[in-house]
C-alpha cells in the first residue's frame, strides 16, 4: 500500500516538474522573442544611436576638440552628423580576428595620412554589439595598421625595430598571449606593404616627423574621460582638453567606441530599450533609411514620442520622396549628380556610382553621349528607356551596356569573371586608333567601390604600365601587379573608400592570369 502511494506521489511530482519545465521554457522563449522584437524596433535603435552620439558630443569631443572625426564605415557613420566630418575610414574587424590579423592592401586607408599629419591626430568612431567593450576594428585592426606604419618609418633610422616599441593594444581587451602572436606577425605585414612600393620609410618620416602613431582608446567608462568634481561644492568642473605629453614623441590616434556594454533588452532607463551597437547591420531594421537620411530628418526621427508605426510610415514617405528626387535629377541634374561625383582615373577611364532603380531616358542618354564614348553599368535594377527613334542603339555594340550584376553580392562577383571577355571586347575600340580623338568610358556600379573597381583594375593591368601610361604591349601580370594598381587606385581616389570584395578580386585574378 505504502509502495503504491509513493509511486503515485512520485509520478505526480514528476508531472508537476515537467509542466513547470515547460512553462519555464515557454516563458524564456517569450522573453527571447520580446528581446528580438525590441532589438529590431526602429524607435529603440534610433534613440540608442542618439544616446551614443550624445556621449561622443558631450564626453569625447570636449576632451579632444582639435582632432577631426573619422567615422569608421559602415556602422560609425550613423553616430556622426554628416556636417561634423569630411572623411571616413574603413577598418574591418575581420582583420583583427584571432589568427586572421592582417594589414589589408584592399583597405589601406592612406587617405588619412595627410589628415593625421595636418591635425596631429584624429578620432576614429565606431561601435560594437553586445558582449564587447571595444570592437576588434579598434582594439586590433587599427593598432596593427599603426604598428606596421610605425615599423616602416623607424626602419629609416633603426636597423632592428623593437616591435614592443611600436605595437600598442588595449591590455584589458587583448590578452598577453594574443599580443605576443600579433607582435610576431608585424614584420611579415611590413614586408607585405613594402612589396607594393607605394610608401617608404623616408616618406613616412617626412609625414610624421619621426613621431609614432599611438592608439588611445576611449569608451563609456574610460578613466581618461572622467570629469573632476569640486571637493567643496560638488559641482562638475568643465572638461579640460587633453594635450599630448611633451615627453611623448607620438601622434594620438583616438579610437572611440560610442556604445556601452549592455545586456539585450535590460536597459530601459531612458524611456526606451537600449540596443548596444544599434547601427550595426542597418539593412535588417531600417526599412531603407540610411545615415544621411537619418541626420537630415533628425527633428522627426529623433523624437522619442513617436511610435514604431509612425516612424515606419515617415521612413516610407522619405523613401518615396527620394525616388521622386532621383527622377528629377536624372532629367534635370548634371551627370555628377546622377552618377555620384564622377572621378577621372585616366584620360580614357572614369568611375561613377549609379543609383538603384535609375531609368536612363533619352535626355540623360544624350548628356552621357556628349561626354563619353562608352558607358558600362553593373546593376540589377538600372534600365534604359525604350527609344525607337534612336537607331544607333540597335547595333551589336551599344553605347550603354548594363550587366545585371550587383556589387556586394558574392554570386555577382563570381559571375563577373565570365563577363570580362565581353567587356574587354566592347572597349577595345577605345584603345585603338589613338590618333583619333575618342571620348573616355564611364564605368559604374551601385556602390562605386566594388565591381566597377574590379573592371577598371582589369583594364589598368592589360592596357597600362604601372605608371598608368597607355601601352600597346601586354604587360607582365601577377597578383602583385594587380595589388599595385589597386593601391594606386585607392591613393588616387582620396574621397572614395574603395573596397572591392574578395570574390571580385578573385574574378579579376582569374581573368588576368
From Swiss-Prot:
InterPro entries: Rit1, Rit1_DUSP-like, Rit1_N. GO terms for biological process: charged-tRNA amino acid modification. The keyword Glycosyltransferase applies. Its EC number is 2.4.2.-. tRNA backbone modifying enzyme that mediates initiator/ elongator tRNA discrimination. This enzyme modifies exclusively the initiator tRNA in position 64 using 5'-phosphoribosyl-1'-pyrophosphate as the modification donor. Recognize the stem-loop IV region that is unique in eukaryotic cytoplasmic initiator tRNAs. It is an enzyme of class 2 (transferase). It comes from Saccharomyces cerevisiae (strain ATCC 204508 / S288c) (Baker's yeast). GO terms for molecular function: pentosyltransferase activity; tRNA adenosine(64)-2'-O-ribosylphosphate transferase activity. Signal peptide: none annotated. This is tRNA A64-2'-O-ribosylphosphate transferase. One of its GO terms (cellular component) is cytoplasm. The gene is RIT1. Keywords: Glycosyltransferase, Transferase, tRNA processing. The keyword Translocase does not apply. Present with 259 molecules/cell in log phase SD medium.
Amino acid at each position: 500500500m505504502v509502495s503504491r502511494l509513493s509511486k503515485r506521489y512520485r509520478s505526480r511530482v514528476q508531472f508537476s516538474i515537467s509542466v513547470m519545465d515547460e512553462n519555464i521554457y515557454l516563458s524564456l522563449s517569450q522573453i527571447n522573442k520580446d528581446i528580438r522584437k525590441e532589438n529590431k524596433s526602429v524607435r529603440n535603435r534610433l534613440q540608442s544611436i542618439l544616446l551614443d552620439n550624445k556621449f561622443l558630443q558631450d564626453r569625447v569631443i570636449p576632451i579632444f576638440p582639435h582632432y577631426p572625426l573619422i567615422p569608421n564605415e559602415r556602422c560609425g557613420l550613423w553616430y556622426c552628423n554628416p556636417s561634423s566630418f569630411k572623411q571616413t575610414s574603413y577598418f574591418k574587424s575581420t582583420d583583427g580576428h584571432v589568427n586572421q590579423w592582417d594589414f589589408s592592401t584592399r583597405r589601406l586607408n592612406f587617405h588619412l595620412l595627410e589628415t593625421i599629419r595636418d591635425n596631429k591626430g584624429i578620432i576614429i568612431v565606431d561601435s560594437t554589439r553586445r558582449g564587447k567593450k571595444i570592437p576588434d576594428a579598434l582594439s586590433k585592426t587599427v593598432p596593427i595598421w599603426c604598428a606596421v606604419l610605425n615599423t616602416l618609418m623607424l626602419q629609416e633610422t633603426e636597423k632592428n625595430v623593437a616591435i614592443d616599441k611600436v605595437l600598442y593594444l588595449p591590455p584589458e581587451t587583448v590578452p598577453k598571449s594574443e599580443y605576443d602572436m600579433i607582435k610576431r606577425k608585424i614584420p611579415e605585414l611590413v614586408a607585405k606593404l613594402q612589396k607594393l612600393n607605394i610608401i617608404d620609410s623616408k616618406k613616412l618620416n617626412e609625414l610624421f616627423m619621426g613621431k609614432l602613431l599611438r592608439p588611445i582608446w576611449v569608451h563609456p567608462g574610460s578613466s581618461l574621460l572622467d570629469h573632476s568634481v569640486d571637493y567643496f561644492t560638488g559641482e562638475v568642473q568643465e572638461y579640460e582638453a587633453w594635450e599630448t605629453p611633451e615627453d611623448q614623441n607620438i601622434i594620438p590616434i583616438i579610437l572611440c567606441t560610442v556604445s556601452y556594454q549592455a545586456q539585450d533588452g535590460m536597459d530601459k532607463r531612458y524611456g526606451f530599450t537600449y540596443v548596444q551597437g544599434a547601427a550595426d547591420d542597418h539593412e535588417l531594421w531600417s526599412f531603407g533609411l540610411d545615415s544621411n537620411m537619418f541626420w537630415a530628418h533628425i527633428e522627426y526621427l529623433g523624437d522619442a514620442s513617436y511610435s514604431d508605426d509612425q516612424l515606419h510610415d515617415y521612413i516610407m514617405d522619405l523613401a518615396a520622396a527620394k525616388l521622386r528626387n532621383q527622377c528629377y535629377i536624372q532629367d534635370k541634374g548634371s551627370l555628377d549628380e546622377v552618377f555620384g561625383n564622377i572621378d577621372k582615373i585616366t584620360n580614357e577611364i572614369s568611375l561613377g556610382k549609379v543609383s538603384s532603380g535609375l531609368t536612363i531616358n533619352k535626355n540623360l542618354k544624350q548628356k552621357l553621349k556628349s561626354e563619353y564614348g562608352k558607358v558600362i553599368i553593373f546593376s540589377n535594377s538600372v534600365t534604359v528607356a525604350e527609344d525607337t527613334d534612336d537607331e544607333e542603339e540597335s547595333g551589336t555594340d551599344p553605347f550603354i551596356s548594363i550587366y545585371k550584376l550587383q556589387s556586394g553580392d558574392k554570386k555577382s562577383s563570381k559571375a563577373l569573371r565570365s563577363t570580362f571577355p565581353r567587356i574587354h571586347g566592347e572597349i577595345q575600340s577605345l584603345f585603338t586608333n589613338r590618333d583619333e580623338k575618342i571620348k573616355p568610358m564611364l564605368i559604374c556600379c551601385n556602390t562605386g567601390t566594388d565591381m566597377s573597381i574590379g573592371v577598371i583594375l582589369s583594364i589598368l593591368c592589360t592596357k597600362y604600365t604601372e605608371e598608368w601610361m597607355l601601352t600597346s604591349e601586354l604587360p607582365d601580370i601577377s597578383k602583385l601587379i594587380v595589388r599595385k594598381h589597386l593601391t594606386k587606385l585607392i591613393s588616387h581616389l582620396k574621397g572614395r573608400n574603395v573596397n572591392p570584395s574578395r570574390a571580385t578580386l578573385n574574378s579579376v585574378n582569374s581573368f588576368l592570369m
